Amino acid sequence: MEYVKSKKYDTEELQSMIMGPNPVKLCEELLIGNQIPENAVVCDLGSGSGLTSVFLAKEYGFVVYAEDLWSDPVENRRFFDRMGLDRSRIIPIKADATDLPFEKEFFDAVVSTDSYNYFGRDERYLDDKLLPFVKTGGYICIAIPGMKKDCHDALPPELLLSWTPEQLEYMHDLSYWTALVKKCVGAELVCAKEMESNSEVWADWLKQDNEYAVGDRKSMEAGGGKYLNFISIVLRKK
């Protein structure tokens, strides 16, 4: 696909901040045709270094709460300031996605790019841990790394060059995720599908020099990418 919004984030400085396959491009594809209005209060769930949070604030005009457990909110705030964003429009929050510190029905929407698979595999997560903080009618938009077909009973050797079976347990196919989110009582499934983004977002990641990207090259150079995809899920709170 053509990444119209993301291309301005292809600078060396910003790309060095990504923590996996290019999350900005994944976020752009995820939000194609989205119904979230400008000035909506949005949680960037698992925001990492805050690059997707900047993208959401600048390109869509959302008021963004950049929630992440592992990133330093002080560092993220400095980054947001450097990017010229008003402090009232983007707020870094250090929090656990399973114990969010917000008022009930605080958010108009939630966007989660390349992180939901770490905390959202509990079938009660949506109903118990996330939806209480979303207004009725609000959207939950999720982009996650997945598998074209679950193969945990016979993992391909190419994948094991970079990842352990325990790490691969966080990745599943479309049917797994569709069945999981359909168990949610408080939200309707709008769509769940395989994303077009794959090889290009991986290429952006693999050319980085950090140790995690270097480690992932082993599997991808051996052809492991043919087993992998990205999955988008959109739900709406009832």
State each model region's role:
Residues 12-28:
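Conserved SAM-binding loop and adjacent beta-strand
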Residues 43, 49-99:
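Class I SAM-dependent methyltransferase SAM/SAH-binding core
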Residues 109-122:
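A short SAM/SAH-binding and catalytic strip from SAM-dependent methyltransferases
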Residues 124-139:
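A short glycine-rich, Lys/Arg-flanked "PGG" loop and its adjoining helix->strand segment in the class I
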Residues 169-185:
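Short alpha-helix
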